[in-house]
Structures are given as structure tokens and as C-alpha cells.
């Protein structure tokens, strides 16, 4: 069995909900605290060395540290560039491209190109119809 098939299979076994035609690159790290809270749509490519988390810590002025968690949802026809870090529970819409090396801390609407640290909307994609192959 090729690594293209093994990675999604193993991630599904851990509890992540994965759609069809999903490619997971080498060294992609998924949050292991509650993988069932991660949902990945169809036709998604997550390239190498990405980190997907759905928990974070929030500090207050009085020194109290709160631990938060939530659902991480990745829509259909999404491309996540190499070395991207998703640091909070967020929703990524359909037809989204996230540039390599981005840090994503907020929801991303559909039909959008984002990149940077922290991520910034670079452009709204003018897609009439999503193709079967994104890359």
C-alpha cells in the first residue's frame, strides 16, 4: 500500500473524519488530544510539515491560563501549503488556498487565497467551478 493511501487511512483510524481524494503529505501533525473534532472535506491537499491543532491556551492579566478546544473543519477543494500551522479551532471554507508557511488563527471564508503570519486574505478566488484536481 502506498504512503498516499496509508496516511489518510491511519489518520481515519485515529478518529479524524476525512472525505474523498484527500492527500496528506509527509510529516503532517494532527492534534492527538481529540482527533474526532477534526473534519476534512473532499479533494483536500495538506502538504508536508503542516501542523493542525484544535486547542489553544489563553492567558489573562491575573495570571490565569485557560485551556480551550473546539472543532477544526476544513471544507472541500482546499490546498494547504507546506509548513502551515493552524493553531485554533476554526472553519476553513471551500475552494481555499493557504500559502506555504502561513499561521492560521481565524476562520477563512470560501473562495479565498490567504497567506502570512498571521494569515491575511490575499484575494478572493474567482472560481466558476471547482476542478477535480486542485494541484
List each model region and its residues.
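Left-handed beta-helix
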Residues: 14, 20, 25-26, 31, ...
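Flexible, solvent-exposed loop segments that connect beta-strands
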Residues: 60-66
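Glycine/Thr-rich phosphate-binding loops of Rossmann-like dinucleotide-binding domains
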Residues: 32, 54, 60, 122
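Terminal amphipathic alpha-helical/low-complexity segments used for targeting or macromolecular assembly
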Residues: 1-15, 21, 43, 56, ...
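Short, glycine/charged-enriched secondary-structure capping and boundary segments
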Residues: 61, 112-113, 127-130
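Generic signature of intrinsically disordered, low-complexity segments enriched in small/polar residues
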Residues: 33, 80-82, 120, 127
